[in-house]
């Protein structure tokens, strides 16, 4: 099978589950729907390949799954440490005001005054809500190669995030340059 261009890293195999070839997957997201619904997973161990996911369920915060061709506990243990990737196109559909974090990374961020703040470099969760990590472009006049890149941390909540336009690749926020 041809490797899809839209693969997203969603977790890793942390070990075997039981004796019958099931694997335990530690998802990188609290929402493991993509792992539960995608029929094909891409693993990087022993070499990069696709595998059919036959059955899966949530178990104590992890996902446990039965994969085609993984016949017993030893075969499942041999996959320990393998990363799991799924095509973005296989993720479950979301409602209009819901977003997968992977879709926000790379979007430009500007404030209500039209000032460009930077680009979303990552997302993180502080327990209360998600946070946009926005990489601020370094000023051209900065000549110090050791200067640390600037970063804004903007809560991804309705109070600060006004619009997310995935088509225009832009997020508009109520956030000042001096916050």
From Swiss-Prot:
Q: Which UniProt keywords apply?
A: Chaperone, Cytoplasm, Ribosome biogenesis, rRNA processing
Query: What residues does the PRC barrel domain cover?
Result: 96-179
What top-level branch of life does the organism fall under? Bacteria
- State any GO BP term from the record: ribosomal small subunit biogenesis
Gene3D superfamilies under this entry? PRC-barrel domain, RimM
Q: Which GO terms describe its molecular function?
A: ribosome binding
GO cellular component term of the entry, any: cytoplasm
Subcellular location(s) per record: Cytoplasm
Q: What the protein does?
A: An accessory protein needed during the final step in the assembly of 30S ribosomal subunit, possibly for assembly of the head region. Essential for efficient processing of 16S rRNA. May be needed both before and after RbfA during the maturation of 16S rRNA. It has affinity for free ribosomal 30S subunits but not for 70S ribosomes.
Please quote what the entry notes about the protein's domains.
Answer: The PRC barrel domain binds ribosomal protein uS19.
* SUBUNIT field: Binds ribosomal protein uS19.
Q: Belongs to which family?
A: Belongs to the RimM family.
The name this protein carries in UniProt is Ribosome maturation factor RimM
Source species of the chain? Janthinobacterium sp. (strain Marseille)
